[in-house]
């Protein structure tokens, strides 16, 4: 078996919050497979399913753009190297412009090739390089996604939390344009985005959207937990089923207590809005970006990075 590197142990620690020795043992037991090691730690009760890394190294901003009319929306993440630059007005303006331009782009590469919105003589890539030269830091468009209601009726809305560190884009579908324009429906879209931002473990709208392989993985983890190993099989099955149902609800938006009224669920809220709008309304999809999620900050010379992106040797 290959030797378990310190980097691999650190990655597992960041993903699970487990101790160094537990992570090393888990990786040895799973031959260095991080995802299997996470499940091994969960079966041992050492790691929880909902642990998120709190060691995010990248700076920058997550921002959104909603086209007038609410039919097109963008969620974008642009990274820089320090919080100082992230709070700079020139950087903020750049990010807002990039969010707007990403509405008509299908990839980062195509976005970079567009004429820049503030100066058509420049491409977006050239505008970014000018900002790099002015601010002295590397700047990169990490990712973006756009939602467009081309063949459906409804509304797209967004929410930005903690000054651009968390962003959510939501699409809500209705039966008619009148329904989409309903104030209650539009408020639901914004409140759903806010709910997703407040619930970091939520990954799906409803249980029926959860892939079969995710359900099976949860079943395998729960079935392998040591605290039920000695119980009769029929009791084990009931415990496992109850735990799976609870876990799957933790992953779904509609099963969460509504943040503005904990006495009802998001599903209850949607039903209330349906009744007021007089037609079917549903949250169809969402995306959440957390600034720097999954990025490891490299130890490097910042001046050399800037020069490399500027094409200077």
Curated annotation (Swiss-Prot):
Task performed by this protein: Associates with the EF-Tu.GDP complex and induces the exchange of GDP to GTP. It remains bound to the aminoacyl-tRNA.EF-Tu.GTP complex up to the GTP hydrolysis stage on the ribosome.
GO molecular function: translation elongation factor activity
Organism for this UniProt entry: Nostoc sp. (strain PCC 7120 / SAG 25.82 / UTEX 2576)
Gene3D superfamilies registered for this protein in UniProt: 1.10.286.20, DNA helicase RuvA subunit, C-terminal domain, Elongation factor Ts, dimerisation domain
Pfam families the record matches: EF_TS
Similarity remark: Belongs to the EF-Ts family.
Coarse class of the protein's main subcellular location: cytoplasm
Name the UniProt record assigns to this protein: Elongation factor Ts
InterPro entries the record matches: EF-Ts_dimer_sf, Transl_elong_EFTs/EF1B, Transl_elong_EFTs/EF1B_dimer, Transl_elong_Ts_CS, UBA-like_sf
Domain of life: Bacteria
Localisation per UniProt entry: Cytoplasm
Alphabetically ordered keywords of this record: Cytoplasm, Elongation factor, Protein biosynthesis
Region of interest (Involved in Mg(2+) ion dislocation from EF-Tu), residue spans: 82-85
Keyword NADP carried by entry: no
Annotated GO CC locations: cytoplasm
